[in-house]
Amino acid sequence: MKKIALFITASLIAGNALAAQTYIRNGNIYTHEGQWAAEVGAFGSTDLLKDQDKSYGALLNFGYHGEDFNADLSGLNYRFFGNTGDIVNLGTYLTGSGVAYDQDSANSVKGMDKRKATVDLGLNADIALGDGTVSTYFQHDILNENKGYKTGVNYFHIIDLGVADLVPFAGISYQSSDYNNYYFGVKDKEATAQRKAYHAGGDFSYNLGYKLVYPINDRWEITQTSAYTRLGSDIAHSPIVDSANQWLVGATVAYHF
C-alpha cells in the first residue's frame, strides 16, 4: 500500500481558532456551504481482488456545494424537501457505482469479462438527531450494467474539537443479488481449475470510520479519512475476493472559493 503523508500534527500544535463548518447533507459530509471546492489527495486500501495490481491512487474532486444542490466529481444531489435545521430532509441523487475492473486488474480475474462501473439514481432521507444524522438511501443502476440496487442506513456524528471537526460514522448496506453477482460472481465460461464458477447472492455489508476536517484558514483545509468495511459472506466467499475485511485510509487538501 502506498504510504500517505499526513501533515496535520504540526498544524495542530500551532493552534487554530477557525471553525471547520462541517455539516451533513444528502448523506454526505460537506464543509463551506455555498462555495466551490477543489480537492487533491491520495488513498491506500487493502486488496479487494486477490492478487490485485494496485491498491492506492489519487483522490481528485472539484465542484459546488450549495444549500440544496451539490455537484462534484462524485455525483449530483438535490434536496427537494426540508431546510437546514429541519428534522427531516429528503433528496435525490446521481452517483457513480460499482467496481470497474478487467483481466489486467488482478491475477485472480485473468480471462474474465470486463466489469464496468455504472451510474445509480437514488433517493435519500436525512434525519437530524442533535449533532448526529441518520441517513438512509436507496439507489438503482440506470445504465443496465449490473441491473442491481443498493440500500442502507448510515449514522454520522459531528464532534467539535475546537481546532478541527471529527465525524465518526457507521452504517449497514444491502447489495442486491444482481449487483453482487455482476461484480463478484464467476460465470461458467470464466471458470478455471483455480477459479470455480460462483453465484453471489444479495447480502449485507457493514462499515465504520471517521473523517477529520482541519481548517488551515478560511479557504484551505486538510481532511483525513479512515474506514473499515466488513463484506457480507456472499461477496467474501467469491473466489476472486481477497478478504471480507477491507480498510481504506486517505488524506486530502482542499481549497474553497
From Swiss-Prot:
Q: Give coiled-coil spans as residue ranges.
A: none
Name of the protein: Outer membrane protein OmpV
Q: What is the lineage of its organism?
A: Bacteria, Pseudomonadati, Pseudomonadota, Gammaproteobacteria, Vibrionales
What organism is this sequence from? Vibrio cholerae serotype O1 (strain ATCC 39315 / El Tor Inaba N16961)
Transmembrane stretches, by residue range?
A: none
Query: What's a GO biological-process term for it?
Result: peptidoglycan biosynthetic process
Subcellular location(s): the record lists: Cell outer membrane
Primary subcellular site in the record, as a coarse category: membrane
In the record, the note on similarity to other proteins reads:
Belongs to the MipA/OmpV family.
State the UniProt keywords alphabetically: Cell outer membrane, Membrane, Signal
Record's signal peptide: 1-19
Annotated Pfam families: MipA (PF06629)
Q: Provide the Gene Ontology terms for cellular component.
A: cell outer membrane
